[in-house]
Amino acid sequence: MSSAANHERYMRMAIDLACSEIDRTEGRPFGAVIVNDGKVLGSGANRAILDNDPTAHAEIVAIRDACRKLQSHRLDGSVMYSSCEPCPMCLSAMYWAGIKELYFGCSSQIADHYGFGDRLLHDELCKAPESRQVKSVQLLEQEAVRAFEAWVKAGGTADSVTDWK
């Protein structure tokens, strides 16, 4: 099977997951599949309403599924197939997980047309914290930095999206 055919196969899996949610009143029409070396590592459909969890978007559910199965917080080199262009939260999670490629079906503009707009989030992320609609105030920085100092003293090493390659 050609590479293009494989991409289409996995995308159809994501679309099928999105369509499977239509019959459930709690579901939303989003699905995602994570693949590495031709193996499906995880998959998920949007469960935000069903689980009372606003972070349970299809991509996040798929990342959680794959990480749980692999017993790892990293999915380095994996590919995400999503029925729709991911929102900023889901895209950020992909970076944190080490996912290297994304294929998506509908654009965010199409999602917006059907009432699932996330333009506000894109716009808000470009603003300084004090200019955002969610009030953001930095407080007790010197005390808060102690957690990082303790982490370093304990020999901890951190993941950083700045290390993403």
Model-predicted segments: where are they?
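Glycine/small-residue-rich phosphate/adenosyl-binding loop
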Residues: G42, E59-R68
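A short, polar/charged loop-to-alpha-helix boundary motif
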Residues: L50-V61
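Short loop/turn microsegments at loop-to-beta-strand junctions
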Residues: N6, R28-F30
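Immediate flanking context of iron-sulfur cluster ligation sites
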Residues: S72-C84
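Local cysteine-cluster metal-coordination motifs and their immediate loop/turn environment
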Residues: S82-E101
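Zinc-dependent deaminase
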Residues: M1-D23, Y95-K165
